Amino acid sequence: MKIGFDNDKYLAMQSEHIRERIQKFDNKLYLEFGGKLFDDYHASRVLPGFQPDSKLQMLLQLKDQAEIVIVISAEDIVSSKIRGDYGITYDLDVLRLIDAFQGVGLYVGSVCVTKYTAAPEVEAFEKRLNDLGIRTFRHYKIAGYPNDVAHIVSDEGYGRNDYIETERPLVVITAPGPGSGKMATCLSQLYHEYKRGVKAGYAKFETFPIWNIPLKHPVNLAYEAATADLNDVNMIDPFHLEAYGVTTVNYNRDIEIFPVVNAMFELIAGKSPYKSPTDMGVNMAGNCIVDDEVCREASRKEIVRRYFKCLCQQKITGTVHESERYKLELLMNQAGLNVGSRAVEQQAHARSEATGGAPATAIELSDGTVITGKTGPLLGATASALINALKALAGIPQETDLVSAAAIEPIQTLKTNYLGGKNPRLHTDEILIALSSSAATNELAAAALHQLPNLKGCDVHSTVLLSGVDTGTRNRLGMYLTCDPVYEEEDRKYHKQ
C-alpha cells in the first residue's frame, strides 16, 4: 500500500497542539470529541497510513492529563436506539466504551445523561452504572435551546444542570453517536466552571472536513460522501475569512451554529476566545499529508464505494432517501468519477459475461493486477476469487488445487444434508477453514495462507450482492468491497443477509 499520511508525525503534532490549547485556558479544557475514536476506518481508507486507532493512540500520549466523560441522551435510552456498526443499543455501547477506555489505561470519570427526563429505563441505566462504581450526572432539556441564549446561559438554563465533577486538565467529551449532546455538555460545564472561578476552555476535535486543504479536495468530498445521509455540506468558513483573510473549510452545521455558540461564550466568559468555527478546532491531520496524490486517489475510490453502498442499501432495505443518492451522484460528478471506470469492476463483469452471466468477483492487488473468480460447482465466485488471489500473491500457478475436491465435498454434504442449507458452494470463511486444514500437510496451501495479510486494502467487486458471511469475512480481512445492487436470484422476494 502506498503511504500518503505520516501517522507518527500526526500523533506527536496532534497531542502537542492539544497541550498548547489546554495552556491557553486556566489549565482546564473541555474537548468535544467527534467521530470514531477506536476504529476510524474511514480515515484510514482516505488517508493511507492513518491507523484506525490513531486518535486513541494520540489520547494515550495525554492519558496522565485526560479523563473521559461519556454522554448519552435520555431519549436514546428510552427508544433503545441502535448503533448501526455494532448492532447494540446506545446504553450498552456506553458500557462497551467504558470497558474499552479502561482497558487501554484511560480514566473514565463519569457518564452524563443529557435531555434528562424521568423514565424507568433511564433510572435503571443510572442505577446499573452506579452499582458498577461509575458516577452519573444529569443535564436537562432547556426551553428555547439553542437560540434563546440569555435563558440558556442562566441559572434557569445551564444552571439547572448537574456540575460534572472532574479531576484532570483535559476532559474528553465523547458519546455513542451523534445527537447525544456533546457540545451542550461542554458549554454547560464552562458555565459552571466560570461560576467557580475557573476560566476553562472549549475546543472541538474532528478529523473531517480537513480545514487546511481545498474545499473540493477528494478527501473532503469523501467526508461529504460518508455523511450523505445527514446531508452535511462542506463550506468555506466565512467567519475565518472575515477575521483573518484566510480561506479554510468547515461544515455547514458548525458554521450555522457559530453565532449562537459565540454569544454563549460572551455571556459565560465576558468575551469569546474564538473568531470562527475553524478557531475552535484542534485538528492537525492536514499537516501530516505527505503524498497528496495518494490521498486524492484513495479518496476517489472511497467516494465510489460510498455510492455503491448507497445503491446496495436501497436494494436491500428500500429505506434510503433519494436525496442521499442524488448527493452521492453529485459528489461522483464533482470528483470526475463514473461507475464502471475501475478495472476491478470491468474485470468482474467481463468474467461474468464469459460464464453466461453467472456471478463473478474481481480483486485488485496492490500492484494493480486484477484477479477474478467465477461461480463453480464447489466454490462461490467470491471464495474462488479469494483463493485465486492468494495463489497469485504466493506465485502458485492458477491451475493448482490448494484444496482438493475430496476435501470440499464432505463440507458440502454437511451444509446441505445436515445443516439445512440449499447452496452447496463454499463461502469465503468456509474455504479459508478448508485451506487452513490443507496447510497442515500441503506446503503450497500453507504458502497461500500466509499471503492473507497482503489482501488488506485490496479493492473487491462482485457482480451480485453478497451474503452477510462473505461481506463480514472481507471486512475482517481489511478488503474494500463493492457490489452491484443485484441479487443472484432477482425473482425471489426474501433474501437472507
What is each model feature region?
Residues 1-173, 189-351, 355-358, 365-367, ...:
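Flexible phosphate-sensing "switch/lid" loops adjacent to ATP/NTP-binding sites
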Residues 177-178:
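The conserved Walker
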Residues 182, 360-362:
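Transmembrane alpha-helical segments and their cytosolic interface motifs
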Residues 185:
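Hydrophobic positions on the alpha1 helix immediately C-terminal to the Walker A/P-loop
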Residues 374-375:
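Short clusters of small/polar residues that mark proteolytic maturation junctions
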Residues 378-394:
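A short, polar/charged loop-to-alpha-helix boundary motif
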Residues 392-424:
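Short HxH-centered metal-ligating active-site micro-motif
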